[in-house]
A protein has these predicted regions:
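Catalytic cores of histone-lysine modification enzymes
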Residues: 2-93
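C-terminal SET catalytic tail plus cysteine-rich post-SET Zn-binding segment of SAM-dependent SET-domain
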Residues: 88-151
Length: 151
């Protein structure tokens, strides 16, 4: 299986608790538009393998295309990019590479601000069997929030 052993994250980022159940990625310093935030590597796995992973681990699998996903290499090596939460008005966006996802700042980001991305483009793929895992109520607070996020 193709594998990228390490993920990168900007030294300007850290993982913090968002509430009693969730964590998110936050800026520890100001970030300029266009700065690379994270490069998330891992293992490329077929859909059938995703369904065999522990339920809590499946949420870290990114759909790539044609029934393949990028999964973290292990539970102990989950990069910060896998922890970005959804927002309908994100401040980060991803550039998909062969074996990695690169998140960049879509605008200037203030110190202390949570780094978010929009999950909806990833839901527009060709893999309808994975879609039930990607259904949730968005509470981002954006005035044009999509509400229920689903493929």
């Amino acid at each position: 299986m193709p594998f990228v052993s390490d993920s990168y994250h900007s030294p300007k980022l850290e993982l913090r608790r968002v509430n009693h159940r969730e964590v998110g990625v936050f800026a520890t310093r100001a970030i300029r538009k266009g700065e690379v935030l994270t490069i998330s590597g891992g293992v490329v796995v077929p859909r059938r393998k995703v369904w065999t992973l522990p339920r809590g681990f499946r949420r870290f699998c990114f759909y790539i295309e044609h029934g393949y996903y990028l999964a973290p290499s292990s539970r102990r090596r989950i990069g910060l990019g896998f922890y970005m939460n959804h927002s309908c008005a994100p401040n980060a966006g991803d550039q998909r590479g062969e074996l990695a996802l690169t998140a960049v700042a879509l605008r200037a980001i203030r110190k202390g601000e949570e780094i978010t991305c929009d999950y909806r483009p990833a839901l527009d793929g060709d893999d309808t069997q994975y879609r039930p895992l990607l259904r949730f109520r968005c509470r981002c607070g954006f005035r044009r929030c999509a509400g229920l996020i689903r493929a």
